[in-house]
Amino acid sequence: MALLKANKDLISAGLKEFSVLLNQQVFNDPLVSEEDMVTVVEDWMNFYINYYRQQVTGEPQERDKALQELRQELNTLANPFLAKYRDFLKSHELPSHPPPSS
């Protein structure tokens, strides 16, 4: 079943907005754990899903398919963001072993 044009347009708009949200994030102190950042991103995704749930059109199957596609696409955008955050955390880790004294 193909998505309705109106739903495709909503998904496209949602992805653009979500991408802007992710690109606006500045990583700085205080740092949050990777797990907490995953929770934050999942909360953002749920917010977008709930917002667009009220706007998608069509039969229940068409609406469900549109929301499923939106969730998959949001995940696709979130994964590189979370990888970037993971790398940021690694670059700010304190050494686990003190440097050898001379």
Curated annotation (Swiss-Prot):
Induction: By GATA1 during erythroid maturation.
Tagged with keyword Lipoprotein: no
Keywords: Chaperone, Cytoplasm
Tissues in which the protein is found: Expressed in blood and bone marrow.
A single GO cellular-component term on record: hemoglobin complex
Localization annotation: Cytoplasm
Gene3D superfamilies: AHSP (1.20.58.420)
InterPro entries: A_Hb_stabilising_prot, AHSP_sf
GO molecular function terms attached to this record: hemoglobin binding; unfolded protein binding
Chief location bin: cytoplasm
Entry annotated with the keyword Chaperone: yes
Annotated family: Belongs to the AHSP family.
Role description: Acts as a chaperone to prevent the harmful aggregation of alpha-hemoglobin during normal erythroid cell development. Specifically protects free alpha-hemoglobin from precipitation. It is predicted to modulate pathological states of alpha-hemoglobin excess such as beta-thalassemia.
Subunit structure: Monomer. Forms a heterodimer with free alpha-hemoglobin. Does not bind beta-hemoglobin nor alpha(2)beta(2) hemoglobin A.
Protein name per UniProt: Alpha-hemoglobin-stabilizing protein
Organism of this sequence: Homo sapiens (Human)
